[in-house]
């Protein structure tokens, strides 16, 4: 009887299908340029303060979450999910939305102009996206 119970218990435990669903949505950089990508629900781009790692920020889980880049010739540490190198994927940019906006700035532009000037002159690309634009949580 004990063997039968263990058999049924092991079948019920090991036969469970675990469905891992992706959390978040990604964007793929299919260009030769390094890009800064931001996805949000607002129809205006942020001031850039979310992209840059501040050493006093305590939410960083490891230094692997950041990458160095340049803004106006100065070394700047970005969160990896905003800084997307050529032919690679961003980190999870956004989790749950019906409609969102994807903002993209080329790092070449970010290294020549201030964030304020980029925003004022609209030197970025903006796309309006819905969940239908993502295939397997990824936008290309």
Where are these regions (language model features)?
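Sec-dependent N-terminal signal peptides
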Residues: 4-14
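Intrinsically disordered, low-complexity segments enriched in small/polar residues
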Residues: 16-26, 36-140
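Short solvent-exposed strand-capping/beta-turn motif centered on an Asx-Ser/Thr pair
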Residues: 30-32
């Amino acid at each position: 009887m004990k063997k039968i119970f263990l058999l049924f218990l092991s079948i019920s435990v090991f036969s469970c299908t675990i469905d891992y669903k992706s959390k978040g949505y990604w964007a793929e950089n299919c260009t030769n340029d390094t890009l800064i990508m931001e996805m949000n629900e607002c129809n205006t781009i942020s001031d850039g303060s979310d992209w840059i790692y501040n050493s006093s920020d305590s939410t960083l889980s490891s230094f692997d979450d950041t990458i160095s880049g340049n803004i106006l010739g100065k070394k700047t540490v970005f969160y990896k999910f905003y800084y997307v190198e050529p032919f690679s994927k961003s980190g999870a940019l956004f989790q749950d939305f019906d409609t969102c906006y994807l903002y993209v700035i080329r790092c070449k532009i970010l290294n020549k102009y201030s964030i304020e000037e980029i925003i004022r002159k609209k030197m970025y690309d903006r796309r309006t996206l819905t969940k239908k634009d993502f295939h397997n949580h990824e936008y290309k």
